[in-house]
């Protein structure tokens, strides 16, 4: 069921006689599985293709996947035959949940063949002509797509990425504070769930009763990606936000949900009440509210002293909200707080799905094999 605290919008009117056919690259991994589950009942998108490595190619999805999510494999996916990573899939666009070792070239091949690519992989996030997108934060960065297509010689294809799982929650919280008060410096320490490492991920002997104070490449992503997300597109390049940002990233024995302890300095003086108000009042536009996966208030502020907690709060807003608590004065900077976001939903599959919904609503999908005569439905509860 949808959380009643987070009203879902009505489906948009764009291309109202179409349902878009979707493929998932890397469909057998954890993020790929989450995408398959989210797509199973989606009112706008129909899952028609699943693709993975040659090891899985030719098998039915049910026989190829080691299913790790709650509930059974969705019926729509069970009997789909897993294809290889060749850009000849019968779909209108693809999600990429591929490992970074193969994602870079594969995503370029699909885009060059005319497929819009919604990527969860790191490879193209910081490319100078590729939008790194959180719709509530920087939807205007989609203006870079036409430049990318011209720059790379793509026709109808393009690449849009979503950020690192920890970056996603952090920037959702930073956005209303940047708009209201301006930001100067951010210091963040993460406590990241093991599901963020994929499967089999971190060995149980390494993580059980332990904390691992290193995640390869994670701190670099958290220090660079917010600069692009909170920056601007000037027509030919992205101009970074120019923030001072330092990150420490740790793997902890939690299944789902990344917790982040954040201290920050503001350009304008603000009381704690004003900071809480800015976070609570952060509301998406009418355009975004019409998207099936959107939550009207993507930042939720809790007053309890011991919240947020991954076990209790990771699924707030169907996993699409960032949950904030412990907003207080910082003796070194200005304000400190704790935030939590679901790393596999907002930080991965759900974020990519919301990106695709915005692209569909704005008419970026031209359609290779559109199912005609099926109207976009009202958003469904998941």
Summary of predicted features, one role per range:
Residues 2-214, 237-238, 243-244, 322-323, ...:
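N-terminal Rossmann-like NAD(P) cofactor-binding subdomain of oxidoreductases
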Residues 194-382:
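Charged docking surfaces used in two-component/phosphorelay signaling
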